[in-house]
Amino acid sequence: MEFREQVLDLLAEVAENNIVKENPDVEIFEEGIIDSFQTVGLLLEIQNKLDIEVSIMDFDRDEWATPNKIVEALEELR
C-alpha cells in the first residue's frame, strides 16, 4: 500500500469520517472533523502503525490542517 494511502486510511479511521479521503484539502480542525482527543489518538496511531514518532510539541495545527498537509509532514519525518 502506498504511504499516502496508508496515512489517509489512518486519518479516516481516527476521524471516523471518509471526507478526509474524498477531499484531502478539507480543513480538519476548522470543520470539526478531528478534535483534540482525536489528535492525540492520531499521533499514537502514526507511531504504532507507521513507526513515525511525532511529539505533541512538534505538532502544529496550521502545518497539519489538511490531510494533504499531514501526508507532506509525515513524508518529511519518515
Swiss-Prot record:
Q: Which residues carry this modification: O-(pantetheine 4'-phosphoryl)serine?
A: S36
Q: Predominant location of this chain? A: cytoplasm
Pathway terms, separated by semicolons? Cell wall biogenesis; lipoteichoic acid biosynthesis
Free-text description of this protein's post-translational modifications in UniProt: 4'-phosphopantetheine is transferred from CoA to a specific serine of apo-DCP.
What cellular component GO annotations does this protein have? cytoplasm
- Write out the annotated subcellular location: Cytoplasm
Q: What does this protein do?
A: Carrier protein involved in the D-alanylation of lipoteichoic acid (LTA). The loading of thioester-linked D-alanine onto DltC is catalyzed by D-alanine--D-alanyl carrier protein ligase DltA. The DltC-carried D-alanyl group is further transferred to cell membrane phosphatidylglycerol (PG) by forming an ester bond, probably catalyzed by DltD. D-alanylation of LTA plays an important role in modulating the properties of the cell wall in Gram-positive bacteria, influencing the net charge of the cell wall.
Protein name as annotated: D-alanyl carrier protein
Which gene name belongs to this protein?
A: dltC
